[in-house]
Amino acid sequence: MSNEISRNWPAPAKLNLFLHINGRRADGYHELQTLFQFIDCCDQLDFRVTQTPELILHSNMSAVVADSDNLILRAAKSLQQATSYPGGAEIWLEKRLPMGGGLGGGSSDAATTLVALNQLWNTQLSNDELAAIGLKLGADIPVFIRGFAAFAEGVGERLQAVTPTEFWYLVIAPDAHVSTAAVFQDPLLPRNTPKLGIDTLMSQPWANDCQDLVVSKYPQVAKALGWLLEYAPSRMTGTGACVFGEFSSQQQALAALAKLPSDMQGFVAKGMNISPLIVRLTHP
């Protein structure tokens, strides 16, 4: 068993190009219709297989390591248990994505952990089996495991591959932490958007049902979105706080970024319908 470090496993961010809430289920979860697309801004993970079963996480973000409920460690432990794998792993996380911004960074880190360790441990689970493990940890994890842009329904677990335009995006990360649980519990959240077929959804203007509520409660999000809308069609991703504008070229997105007010943080990224994780898996 090699002690070499397997490097450069990407955990890409995602954008919700639209997000519709169709109702609330008896178990408290919400029925959704959403469109996921990856962007080329990623956290990065390295792994070293160990003979002993311990799972050790290092990170440039001390808050990640201090979190005993960390999704990376939970994902690795779940794969260990599902396969009765006797060894363990040492994991290094370089955190580049904003935390808690609606970009799916934590879910993506967990998905990359499952995919990478499944290969490095040679546990030979299928993508379906990995996605089933991931779904128990978080509704967004399966889309990162499958690695293709997808139309999602249910609580986000029913996925259909799609190929939306791969725009350039200017993503702004407001200085606000939006609680996903609080958004979905808020009585003012719209919950009755009609379910529509994928062809209709793909051809109509896109919107995020959480956006108006979050904008009304978080002035930093309102300010960022208001500024971005002056330059491009723009929306919020997930339950926020990040917002994104669509540009047809990198040059246009960078030109807008150059004008970003000094009290805002942002970056330019390319939309990707195939995850960088899939590229890493097939071209190590």
Swiss-Prot record:
The keyword Zinc-finger does not apply. Belongs to the GHMP kinase family. IspE subfamily. It comes from the Bacteria. Its EC number is 2.7.1.148. It catalyses: 4-CDP-2-C-methyl-D-erythritol + ATP = 4-CDP-2-C-methyl-D-erythritol 2-phosphate + ADP + H(+). Pathway: Isoprenoid biosynthesis; isopentenyl diphosphate biosynthesis via DXP pathway; isopentenyl diphosphate from 1-deoxy-D-xylulose 5-phosphate: step 3/6. ATP binds at residues 98-108. InterPro entries: GHMP_kinase_C_dom, GHMP_kinase_C_sf, GHMP_kinase_N_dom, IspE, Ribosomal_Su5_D2-typ_SF, Ribsml_uS5_D2-typ_fold_subgr. Catalyzes the phosphorylation of the position 2 hydroxy group of 4-diphosphocytidyl-2C-methyl-D-erythritol. Pfam families: GHMP_kinases_C (PF08544), GHMP_kinases_N (PF00288). One of its GO terms (biological process) is terpenoid biosynthetic process. Keywords: ATP-binding, Isoprene biosynthesis, Kinase, Nucleotide-binding, Transferase. It comes from Shewanella sp. (strain ANA-3). NCBIfam families: ispE. GO terms for molecular function: 4-(cytidine 5'-diphospho)-2-C-methyl-D-erythritol kinase activity; ATP binding. This is 4-diphosphocytidyl-2-C-methyl-D-erythritol kinase. The active site is at residues 14, 140.
